[in-house]
Amino acid sequence: MSIKNVPEVQEFNNGDKIWDHTFNTFHAKVYIPKSKLPGDIINFGYSAPYFLIFTDFIFTNENALSYAKTSKLSEIASAYDTSIVFINPLNAGGWKSAPEGIFEEIIENSKIHQYHKDGYAILNNRFTHTTEGYAIRGAIFRTFLIGNGDGADYIAKYLLKKITGAGLWGPADIAPTVCLLENLSIKPLKKRRDIPIISVGNSKLINETISEKFDNCIFQESLDIPAAFKFMKQFIRWGWDGELLREIDFNEVNFIEEPCVVELKTSPDNQGDYAGSVTHKTGFISYYNKNVFDKGPVPLVLCFHGGGDSAKHIALVSSWWKVAHDHNFLLVCVEDHLNSTATEMMELLEILKTKYRIDEKRIYASGFSMGGCKTWDLYQEYPDVFAAVAPMDATFDVGCNLYGQPSVGLHGCGKINENILVPVFYTGGEETPLPELPFQAEKCRARMEYVLKVNECTANYNIKFEDQNKWENKIWGINGDSVEKIEDKSRNSVLTINYFNSKDENIYTAFGSISGQGHECRYHTCEQAWFFMSRFQRNKDKIEIHNCQL
């Protein structure tokens, strides 16, 4: 159950903020230090720690401020654009007699969302144009629990195990990512070894038990939050099965993550939050290998996240960053692109050209879900800019933009691209609940027909959606001129790619489906998209083969 009303936020003289809310089983006090990051433009929530402090009594604002400052948690939270949440149970007797289920309710009321402010997520529905409630802003896959005394005992007794609750995409294992346990009076009840433990001020016997029962643990005589966080930040718990993963330290692999904010002119067709404004700010995050520009201009991939997600999300969850790292190109992930148009992306592109040494013949675009729709916008409106595109897992009707409205057309002429060839690598999950592939929706079939026509493919795509029982290919309607199956061993799935020949006997068009995949974006698919796109470069109005033939 989400928070129904906007939290009442109190602001301190130094810019820090705080608010309270009472849920069914617990009280939460959310303290938000003034951020050192441009968090109002770029959503850093995906990579931010979610600090949950299990307190022995309901903190006053002064208690919370004092704890945050003294422990130096406020400095860490400020550096990551996150908050510190103090949790106290509502039952009589505090944590000592608190029932199970409190953590599950905390997670159910915690969200990372496109819209957020002052430590809470604003659950806007862009399709119904309504606000469905509010939630504590926090990444449920980076829950760092801190307990002292009875709070630590509660964690040790109930939370060091598999916990089923509300995950990102439905029921999932939501076990804590890392637990800091200070002044325990009981031995932790081990139900799983993979929960990292920071033991603070505990007895030799308890420390021996922790060392024996848990795979990742460190020990402190007295609380040292900066040292504890250095250990905490290594970990993330991901997926429906709650797998514990170690984060890559970009500094260790000489990789740059560079957030930037720019101001763009608002185009007339903008129907997002900035409609009618003269200008608006847009954020992006660039990812590239250190010294990558030393040898000359490099390829650029413009990347667009899914609806409700963020630039960090598409870079890190899909591992596009790793593709850029492994194959030495510049990745630019655009923040909140649903509130920017294809035309505005052209202005952004010009800004990027002045900031980085970009090979203008090798500019590519890709996106997942609503980001895939943005990529289709670029194909329809600015095809002559891109050497290739890789939209994934979504489409609107041909001729519509990502607002579901008629496109302004080729460079704003009112008519969409009909004859400018752009290499396309499109993929979708075979088990997705959303319409991504031709067998799932007429608009997907029509999109494929449109691309085959624009790219002058020789295949005869004379099929109808209602005649699926007659299709030779149950997913695409027809078979490609050639077919390739590429195994993704990490996910036990297969990417099946149908390639279609164009009139010049080259292959510019690929449609792929992934077995066992729902609505998601995977590293394997992104890397294959790069392999395909990187073959091409654009020389004015002509596509040239840059690499070897398929």
Predicted segment positions?
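Alpha-helical scaffolding within the catalytic cores
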Residues: 65-74, 184-191, 313-321, 373-376, ...
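Conserved acidic catalytic loop of the alpha/beta-hydrolase fold
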Residues: 102-141, 344-361
